């Protein structure tokens, strides 16, 4: 895109800051439901609320013409990818420190770079391989204390990053198929029933931590709030990207990690330690190295809430 005026860029970056901060607020709300309701059920209810809200928005903006489903198999792939990412991320933030889960999920652009070579046939630059090595060194540093304390649950955010990487890859293949709001609606329409099925199956076979019992009104309200913060956050990020460009907005993704660390400390008494900070710094460094190697850069996504 052509260079935007400085005042417009400043406004766009402030709006992006608000968008990424809202995503972290939603993540903190999800974490506050740990022990109240299983993460798969929370993710299913959140996406069903999201689908209803987006349906209303599509109807108001595009009318009946907005209810289309281009390239159904590709939409199924997008929905399955975001369903996996959301459920794994919610499981992760409920089990481990919010900042650690957020940092590990930020490896999704690194995984996307790998998938772009395997799936889209794009050349992966040498700098991207260096970024991959640095970021995954950071993941190992962050995972080690969490793995010792939690076991396999510590790998949930990595599953979320894998799902987001597939979503970004599918999004690039489906670019231009329909307006952005319509594409968000089709995404939610596929993810919502998939998450309902997953939550039901895990409730039957997943053990005590996955059993869906009676939910309180607070849980329903919190799930609705997460749907609102996520949809609003992604809309603000998209607006900022269209007005300032992905190259300027993408590095601001890491504001989300700073906000997550602050909320984790203030809300859940999760004071960051030196080891986690070192690992998170490596992940951010790898992400920034990847961003510098990309021309054009991938649009920012944030966490999959």
What does each of the following model-derived ranges do?
Residues 2-3, 51-70, 137-149, 192-218, ...:
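Membrane-interface helix-cap regions at the ends of transmembrane helices
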Residues 41-44, 48, 91-121, 246-263:
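Specific alpha-helical transmembrane segments that line the substrate/conduction pathway
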Residues 105, 121-141, 147, 151-156, ...:
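Loop-to-transmembrane alpha-helix entry segments
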Residues 11-19, 58, 64-88, 152-160, ...:
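Loop-to-transmembrane-helix transition segments
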Residues 102-107, 174-190, 231-266:
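Helix-helix packing/entry segments at the starts of transmembrane helices
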Residues 12, 36-84, 163-167, 186-205, ...:
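Transmembrane alpha-helices of multi-pass small-molecule transport proteins
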Residues 2, 254-305:
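C-terminal-most transmembrane helix of multi-pass membrane proteins
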Residues 31, 39-40, 54, 149-208, ...:
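Transmembrane alpha-helical segments that form core, pore/gating elements
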